[in-house]
Amino acid sequence: MRILHVLAQLPIKTGSGVYFTNVIDGLKEFNVEQAAIYATTPEYNFNFVDEKFEVEFQGKDISFPIVGMSDIMPYDNTLYKNMTDEMIESWQKAFREKLIQAREIFKPDVVITHHLWILSSMVCDIFENVKVLGVCHNTDIRQAEKNPAMKDKYVKSLGKLDKILALSSGVIDGIANIYNYPVEKIVNIGAGYNEKIFYPAERYEKYDNVKILYAGKFDESKGFYELIKAFRLLEKKDTKVELELIGNLKDEDRPRVESLVGDSKRIRIYNAVDQVHLGEIMRHKDIFILPSYFEGLGLIAVEALGSGLRVVATEIEGLIEFLGEKINNSEIIEYVKMPTIYDTDKAVEEEKPAFIERLVETLEVMIERTRKERAIPTYLLEEIEQHSWKKKIETIYKLL
């Protein structure tokens, strides 16, 4: 079987980028040939797939930065809503050329295309006689809601998809309604974490301080600024704590972040090179925090659990559903009630102070548990392993 994978972004650094490469990596266990179409820039040299058809942004194919499904990306990006007709035309032309090349040269039996948006619609038109599966990452639903005119103009062919894979059951009705797609052809596939990268430490070092970790976008919609405020309150009560913030700090955000961090000596900010590096970092931390206002799934919280960390997260429906009763009712994860959310991912300003207090209180609970017993019980680690990519890939393979 010959499988072509398609993504309009970098195959790293975002949830969908990591999902994309994890699917490819997982399918290597089966007797398949694989090729990929994705966005890149001149600084990258990817070697994760046998055959690749790259679209180079800020380079030979397209002059402007990669267009991101989220308005805030962990790398330099263009917003769909800000694209001119000329930009859209050059973007479509570059991807169309690669799609046609892949069709003629690689001749796939199946195409897996990520995000229910413009590129997937093009895939449906170009691969009319090939089985095509679309993967919904939820940011595509958000784009469709925020840019309905763009959706109506450029996203017309998703009805041709053989199946749509959803990351949680909670978005199935939304997919069916927004894209007018038959609900019986939508499969709740969920996600999985890469157990080869995210696994617990063999033994835990004894540290004086409890180490708290955040990794992701430095963005309002992630509750990022409220997290810093919460930690500043926490460290006034407990001096034996540290917070590490992993991500890309953009120049325009630096003054605000530095102002909030203030004179704290217990907050470190840096970036991870890749997923392997992130996995190594996680194994030396104690608690992972995900204070986000919007997530399709929040896979990074699952990766943290797989790495043996306790987790504090907001009440993300997809995550709660995904982890299941046994993990949710254990003491290794605690959920924090969000402030009222409007416009998909914005928190009501007046409710943020109470949310910050809730973050502090929940972190205090987890810190106490960590000090009492750092290691996660074996039976819970085994339960978490049920959500690994190994299990998920078997399900995806059966759908091809």
Please report, for each region that a protein language model flagged, where it lies by residue.
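Glycosyltransferase donor-sugar binding loop
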Residues: 215, 242-255, 271
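Carbohydrate-associated surface elements
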Residues: 170, 192
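Acidic anion/phosphate-binding donor-loop and adjacent secondary structure
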Residues: 144-146, 184-185, 193-209
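A conserved mid-protein helix/loop that constitutes part of the nucleotide-sugar donor-binding site
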Residues: 18, 210, 219-233
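Aromatic "clamp/platform" in nucleotide-sugar-dependent glycosyltransferases that forms part
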Residues: 293
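A conserved catalytic-core segment of Leloir-type glycosyltransferases
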Residues: 41-102
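A charged, aromatic-enriched C-terminal amphipathic alpha-helix characteristic of glycosyltransferases
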Residues: 15, 347-361, 365-398
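Nucleotide-activated donor-binding/catalytic signature segment of Leloir-type glycosyltransferases, i.e.
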Residues: 255-276
